[in-house]
């Protein structure tokens, strides 16, 4: 069985990649065509386009992308970049032509319909593992759940390791056919070895590597209000994407608008953070 590490660009997954070597490393990049999200670092854009030719911009922090590139050098092994054919806003606006995905009326992702994670992360990684690593056999995948995150391990079940794979395409006018398959077997080496956040931070402080204070996509609605407020100060240009989609669709990413969450006076730092890398 081939082993795979899914790296997110955050400090925990990078720690895991270094301390628990695997046969393959993969990074799923969340794409956007939003002009305000285009990096001002032209060299970074070129590096991203070398790996993803259709790359325009990402909802990831520039520092996240740089850390992925540097981690590849640290590992001495390729980190394969994967991404959806479509930008995230294409899924929101319902303009994709992917099989099995509804088109037409726009809708926003939320805690019940997290198609952002599914379409931009899980499906590209699963497709890569299925098509280029071990075919119909599942891969052993390291996931970066730490010992101080027991709820993430306890809430995990086998359904998270299954995916509907397309078996045939309707070239002759027929319908797409699918089969649900177990594409990965998840392993939690950090949890097993009782690695906690303090261990991870101490390691990177010693190496003098810095990471984004808030991991995963900028302004992810699954971040805490406190994290959103931090990002509003750092990335006002990217914030426009989220607020504009709420205005255009007449819906919100959660119970409150992004603007309400950012402008509220109370900073609650004890909410559960985003776990999009699940």
Question: PLM features: what roles do these ranges have?
Answer:
Residues 1-278:
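Nucleotide-activated chemistry modules centered on ATP-dependent adenylation/adenylyltransferase
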